[in-house]
């Protein structure tokens, strides 16, 4: 599922300079300038927007989903021509289930996560996602694959999105048929075919441009994925600007931008932000000292009693449940750090817990935490909602 994406991230686009892949196509649906910049100005890409944990989860989920329909043959990732040739060989052998089946025609390329081969000309297409719901961009992803296979003469009997069922609870061996939900999207994909054709035609012309296209900032800079070229495309804005206001909604930032309210000087005279956001603006403009709400701090300090404990957790969220009685993406706490002071002015002491790799940490952590924190003591945490 993620092998082609990995190729783009790790090796660049050179391997597909003469192809529109499904990854490229989906990027173009978001904003065609992404592809133009990747090809012509790749050094401007901010790789910090790439969430490696999400990519790793996607790879693990994709690998697991390959077994949904029993035995399968996976097309090894490598040279694209070799992948296409291997797929044809497997299709000729009537291999029932092919993972990463790869197809190319007329400068278009796609790998299908799971392809069920019904006969010489009929197939079913399954696109695997590690999310817990079906997002709009997934329809475009499947629609591009449908378009490529149809151009090659295959009859796509059904298009499906396979995604995580967040209601699944693991008990014993992992049940992948309960872990995954399959949503048929054939009708939606067929309805998008004219749009796919128009997008491909537009993209081919767009990529011929020698001069940098003049596309403005908009929702596409943030959705469906944050764009790694946003810093470059917003370089003409003053620093600081509306997009650097902490806590403001993206819709609010874009509303201000479209009204020409961009600099902090502009923002200081508008009424579209919150009180806390104006404090940030005033601090920057007038060099105010850090804002300290002494009254609220005083009220909080009145609630403090001793012994006093300071608790912090660390957790992870596996897409695939690792332990019994856990769900996909459930927070699994594996570490805590506990500082405490027994009396006012006393020495700051420390206790901690760190789980052993490979073990379910939940019970041992809970038992030690109960032993480390007495009942009815004052316990503080930076993120009370999470630590509770």
Question: What are the functions of these language-model segments?
Answer:
Residues 80-82, 95-101, 105, 109-116, ...:
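Conserved DEDDh/DEDDy metal-dependent 3′-5′ exonuclease domain
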Residues 3-120, 250-290:
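Metal-dependent nuclease catalytic cores that hydrolyze phosphodiester bonds in DNA/RNA
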Residues 245-265, 269-280, 347-378, 385-388:
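Terminal, non-catalytic protein-protein interaction segments that mediate quaternary/complex assembly
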Residues 133-134, 168-169, 264, 316-320, ...:
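Flexible loop/turn segments at secondary-structure boundaries
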Residues 65, 103, 296-375:
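Conserved RNase H-like, two-metal-ion catalytic cores of nucleic-acid enzymes
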Residues 117-122, 236, 341-345:
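Short acidic-glycine loop/turn motifs at beta-strand connectors
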Residues 17, 23-24, 28-29, 53-55, ...:
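Cys/His-rich finger/ribbon microdomains and the adjacent scaffold used
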Residues 44, 174-179, 324-331:
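Short secondary-structure boundary/capping segments
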